[in-house]
Amino acid sequence: MKKKGMLNSEISKVLSDLGHTDQIVIADAGLPVPEGVTKIDVALTPGTPSFLDVLKAVKADMVIEGVTLAREIKVDNTENHKQIQEVINDIPITYVTHEQFKALSKQAKAIIRTGEITPYANCILQSGVFF
């Protein structure tokens, strides 16, 4: 049994399989999952686990070179937006419309569905390399 790092075996496998520029999505409970994209559902109850808890856990195990957010988060979910910026630190953020975000999610290797129930609490994480 693993004793540290990502304990969720499905998420751990996806992260291990990522290549440079591959993408995953961390999503709130309501984001639609496109047909053909793997859904890893970790939602337990409304709010559990939170989007930010999952983002922090994934970030600890993943080399991230870019983040994409729906631009609507800047107005409609300012608190989560601020916290996302704090978690990702100096990783570049690209903003797109929510409709563009949903279209981009079709390219993701997986979508991790959280229990988050605040608007636009979704991000696309682009894999980097550690060398």
Curated annotation (Swiss-Prot):
Gene name in the database record: rbsD
NCBIfam families in alphabetical order: PRK11797.1 (NF008761)
Binding-site residues, substrate: 28, 98, 120-122
Metabolic or biological pathway, per its Swiss-Prot or TrEMBL entry: Carbohydrate metabolism; D-ribose degradation; D-ribose 5-phosphate from beta-D-ribopyranose: step 1/2
Organism: Oceanobacillus iheyensis (strain DSM 14371 / CIP 107618 / JCM 11309 / KCTC 3954 / HTE831)
Signal sequence annotation: none
GO BP term (any one): D-ribose catabolic process
Keyword field: Carbohydrate metabolism, Cytoplasm, Isomerase
Subunit note: Homodecamer.
Entry GO CC: cytosol
Catalytic residues identified in the record: 20
SUPFAM superfamilies, sorted: RbsD-like
Role of this protein: Catalyzes the interconversion of beta-pyran and beta-furan forms of D-ribose.
Cell compartments where the protein resides: Cytoplasm
E.C. code: 5.4.99.62
Catalytic activity from the UniProt record: beta-D-ribopyranose = beta-D-ribofuranose
Family to which the UniProt record says this protein belongs: Belongs to the RbsD / FucU family. RbsD subfamily.
PANTHER family: D-RIBOSE PYRANASE
Full protein name: D-ribose pyranase
A molecular function (GO) term: intramolecular lyase activity
